[in-house]
Amino acid sequence: MHASDQTIFALSSGRPPSAIAIVRVSGSRGAKIVEALAGRLPTPRMAMRALIKDRDGEPIDDAVVLWFPGPASATGEDVAEFHIHGGRAVLAALMATLSSFENVRAAEPGEFTRRAFEHGKIDLTEAEGLDDLIHADTDRQRRQALRQLNGLLGDRARDWRAQIIEAQALIEAGIDFADEGDVPDDLLAPALAKIEALAGEIEALLAAQGRSERLRDGLVVAIVGPPNVGKSTLMNQLARREVAIVSPHAGTTRDVIEVHLDLDGYPVTVIDTAGIRDSDDPVEQEGVRRAQARAAEADLVLWLLADDQVAAPAAIESDAPVWLVRNKVDLAGAATGVKPAKNLEANLGQNVPQPSFAISAKRGDGIADLVGALGGFAAEFFGAGEAGAITRQRHRDLLRDALVMLQCSKRGRAEELVAEDLRSASRSLGRLLGQVDVEDVLDALFRDFCIGK
């Protein structure tokens, strides 16, 4: 029996113990299962209280049962839900009973959503939106994912594809029946006008999106600098907890440490790196190499110095902006009575990174200003990302492919070639929606879902 012909079940709520556990069932044997466990089928989409029993008639739990006959259900199949008390023993008894039915099995990760996709309840962009919603860490990520789940891109792509197919039909009618006198002499002009308008809409969407797809992964900020300048202390201040070991001994941090922050709803990953210096220690050398590599990939570099140090960030090979952060200002200023920032400017001249910040990572002085600046940088970096319809590189690539073919079709080509261009553009939008050649994308996407979703 094919996997899609089997009835599946899974825990769709949090892991036990919990107040309530929800077990979802989807497939053709759903009605038989509900009747066997609860005695009868509930009225569709109405909650029914029932003492559910196992195959031997032994009570499992006093539960609430819901019944959603297909195709008017989340998956398009018959769906049942058992709302039980969330104890481990109760859940285990229900799961064991469900497993005892023929052609009924535990669901794979993302299998409920995949069945919803296969039955046309959602398209691929909406499934991706659901995946993003499940994994959203910040409010802006949540809002972006919810828009995608509700068809922000999918609805537009479906409309564009329908219009392309209509234009293609006009052109092919002109080709096929040109000698029969059954169609107007010139069907190409209105079709090309439609194509030009569509190309303009797709081009405008691509131009306006900015970094909307980056909102899923977040902004990367690397803390870089010489050893023992307080990088780990600054990391702990930003995280508001101890995530990195702080020691007075240089070279304590040997590997890259990451912490994920929520700055006004923007996801930011801060990286604490090994101190950059020449060393004979092979382990420390590897730490320095990794620090330089991660700094090169960062969207923003914080070059951290102790307040009395003079050192340019020459070791960083990155096109990202570099901000100077002078740490330990409480110690340096009090001990020397001088202004180290002036010394830095005198020695480095125009090479001083801007903007610059003076902080005490140990005491917390200046941290609020730095965090505020990071939040402003994130807002500018992402722009209106949360409202963007393009949330994955796959979306951008396929929209570009469709746009290229639409633009080709406008260049005075023969009608047969124009029809083929439109066929290619339609295929790209079909792949975007999950209607054409996307099996590898589906496998990768639904593996990322949790079991029960």
UniProtKB/Swiss-Prot annotation:
EC number in record: 3.6.-.-
Cofactor requirement: K(+)
A molecular function GO annotation: GTP binding
The primary site where this protein sits is cytoplasm
Binding site residues for Mg(2+)? 232, 253
Keyword flag GTP-binding: yes
The job of this chain, per UniProt, is described as:
Exhibits a very high intrinsic GTPase hydrolysis rate. Involved in the addition of a carboxymethylaminomethyl (cmnm) group at the wobble position (U34) of certain tRNAs, forming tRNA-cmnm(5)s(2)U34.
What is this protein's record name?
Answer: tRNA modification GTPase MnmE
Q: Which gene encodes it?
A: mnmE
